[in-house]
């Protein structure tokens, strides 16, 4: 792999780790439940992107498949949490 790609991936991983720390802070300190859910959504998206950058760095497809699973589970949990906040129940 070219040196520019390696450095780009390392910079991206560093920025994603920083974004994950900020999202974790928002999730822990959010004054409302909506802020905590937003922090959780941001955290799973950043985790998914971190796995994709690991996949690029190692040229291993397992990371891409894991990122896809995280995306599907994160989307379903976001919908369930939003429905719970609006109606107070998830299953009707």
From Swiss-Prot:
GO biological process per UniProt: potassium ion transport
PANTHER family documented for this protein: NA(+)/H(+) ANTIPORTER SUBUNIT F1 (PTHR34702), NA(+)_H(+) ANTIPORTER SUBUNIT F (PTHR34702:SF1)
Record note on quaternary structure: May form a hetero-oligomeric complex that consists of six subunits: PhaAB, PhaC, PhaD, PhaE, PhaF and PhaG.
UniProt protein name: Probable K(+)/H(+) antiporter subunit F
Keyword annotations: Antiport, Cell membrane, Hydrogen ion transport, Ion transport, Membrane, Potassium, Potassium transport, Transmembrane, Transmembrane helix, Transport
Subcellular location per the Swiss-Prot or TrEMBL entry: Cell membrane
Gene Ontology molecular function: sodium:proton antiporter activity
UniProt key word Ion transport: yes
